[in-house]
Amino acid sequence: MSSSSSPKPADGGRLCVLVHAWPRLSMTFVAQELVGLESQGLNLWIATYGKPDAIRHPIHDQLKAEVHRLADKGVDYPRFLRAFFKVRRKPGFAAALALFRRSMKARATRREWRSFARGVIIAAELPADIRMVYAHFIGSATTVARYAAMIAGLPLAASAHARDIWTSSEDNIRDKLSAMDWCTTCTKLGAEYLQKLSGDPAKVHLIYHGLSFDRFPSDPPRRGNADGSDAPVQLLSVGRAVEKKGFDVLLDALSKLPANLRWHWTHVGGGKILDQLQNQAEALGLSNRISSLGAQDQRQIIDLYRGSDLFVLPCREASDGDRDGLPNVLMEAQSQALACLSTDFSEIPELIIDGQTGVLVPPADAVALTEALDRLIRSPEEREQLGLAGYKRVRSKFEADGGIREIAGLLRKSMQ
C-alpha cells in the first residue's frame, strides 16, 4: 500500500528509510527528523513493517514521502517467494544469505527469519532510484535494513536511540556498526558506548533530537498560584505505561503525600502495564485523584502542558536493561515553561540542571520523589522560576534544525 503523494525523485535519487511502524505516537522525534530531512531537499521512501497507531500527530501528515508497507504480523510468504526469485541472483544476495545462516546458527529465532524475509522483500521492491538504506533504531529495524542493503548493494546507516542500544548484545551492535557507513545517536552516554564498540569510533555521531519549535506555541502561558491548600495542583506525565518510566514509583510517592495536600495527576499514554498501574492506584486509594487519558495527539498534549502546573517523569532502568535516553516529552514540557521533576538518570541531566532548570531526584526513590513533590506542590513561585529557566535553556540549546542539517549532510555524502 502506498500513498499517492510521493515527491518526484531528485537527481541524487531517493533515500530508503526503514522504520518499524509508521505512524507511531511515541516517536515524534522520528517524524520530526524525516519531515526535516524533506525540508532539506532529500527525497524519502519509507519502508515499514509494524502496525501503525490509529491516532496521528499533525506532523505525521506533513511527510510527503511514499510509505511502503509490509505485513505487520509474520511473513507474507507469497510476497517473499516472489521477492526471493527476483533477488537471488543479485551480487549481494549470497553474502546476505551467509549472514542469515551465521545468525541462525548463533541463535535461531523467528525474529531473525522474519528480518531476513523482510529484507529480501524490501530489496526486491526498492524503486530504481534508491541510493541508500537508513534505519531508525539499531535493533530489528537495522537487521532488516542490513539485509536489504546487502542484497541491493547499497550503503547502510542507522540512528540508535535507547532501548535498542541497551537491550542489544555488544556483539550484535559491534557487528552492525561494522557494516554501516555511520551511525547517529541522541545521547552522550549512548554515543560513548557505541564508540567503544565500534572498530571506527569516528563513525558514531552524537546528534541530539532537539525540538522543532515551530510546532509549539512560543509564549509561556499564564499559570495560577495553586499551592495545594485549596485548588489542586495539576500534575502531568506523558509517556507509555512501561517499567522504565517509573510511574509505579510515582504512585508510591503520591500515596505518601500529606492527606490534606490537594493535587491531581493526569497520565497520557497507553502501554502494557496500564492496568497494573490502575490497580496499584486503586489499592493505594488514589483513583479519585488520577486521570488516565490514554493516547492523545500532539495538539491535545500541548494543551495539557499549558494547563498543568508540574510535569513529572521519574525515569529509571527497567529489569531488562531498557532505559530512556533524553525523553522528548521533557523538552516539550519545558518549551511551554512547565516546571519539570525527573530523575538524575541516563541523559536527563544533559537537559535539566538540578535546582536551576528543573528538579532531579535519584531513580526508583519514592521517598525523595515524595519530598520533591511536596515542596514543589506547595511553591508556585519555585515552579514558575524553574519553568521559565527551563523554557529559556531548551529553546536556546535544544533546537532541532542544526542536528537535522548534520544528518542530511551525512546522508548526502553516503548517497554520492
Description of each model-found segment:
Residues 169-171, 195, 211-231:
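Acidic anion/phosphate-binding donor-loop and adjacent secondary structure
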Residues 189, 210:
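Carbohydrate-associated surface elements
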Residues 222-255, 266:
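Conserved donor-binding/catalytic core segment of Leloir-type glycosyltransferases
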Residues 268, 275-299:
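Nucleotide-activated donor-binding/catalytic signature segment of Leloir-type glycosyltransferases, i.e.
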Residues 295-296, 303-308:
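Short alpha-helical donor nucleotide-sugar binding micro-motif in glycosyltransferases
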Residues 306-321, 338:
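Acidic donor-binding loop of glycosyltransferase active sites
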Residues 330-335, 339-342, 352:
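Short hydrophobic beta-strand element within catalytic cores of glycosyltransferases
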Residues 354-355, 359-366, 375-381:
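Conserved acidic donor-binding segment of nucleotide-sugar-dependent glycosyltransferases
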